[in-house]
């Protein structure tokens, strides 16, 4: 059902069984997939592609121009996959031509009230961003990671999969896979043991992850030496995840 007060641009493509509430504005070059629910007073601008079964709550602004001063009105994009919940007052900006030209959000994510996703961000699957968490431009957030309320993430930071970031933390450097971080600026605390349990990693894998963490953070080793010793632990998934996130770091990891 589309409310009669909703304003929908003629170029917008609306899928089947989509609900659009009163006073919502769907702009030009927007594609909305089947079974989406968009509440009242939402603004969706394009070019944007929104997949299936996404639920967007009131007063959110999706796909607006980036405030990046380099942006000159280029037709950059936003892609949101499937089964996401986007709560009240969330803002998500499109990309810039200086980067990928696209902001991307995966599937099965929960963005709580007043979350901000900046231009050119890449958000994986199954993440949770709690109220007022903010990603600056060009940030990458790995699958299954959780950002607590009021977390601020500096531009270009990469946060690996299965991370947990504590309340009001300020993230200035990359966070390796399954690491928990707290503070301002954030510092590593331990492995995300509870998160790994919930994702059904075995007890042996969690022990292995903890051994790798201690090599990285508790032995006082130079990073290259720590990476070498972690690699010697084998090729289990947790080791591969950790090494990949360290080797892909562009800003240096938190230490």
Regions from the PLM with identified roles:
Residues 1-187:
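Structural signal for interior beta-strand "rungs" in well-ordered beta-sheet cores
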Residues 1-5, 10-11, 16-17, 53, ...:
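Terminal amphipathic alpha-helical/low-complexity segments used for targeting or macromolecular assembly
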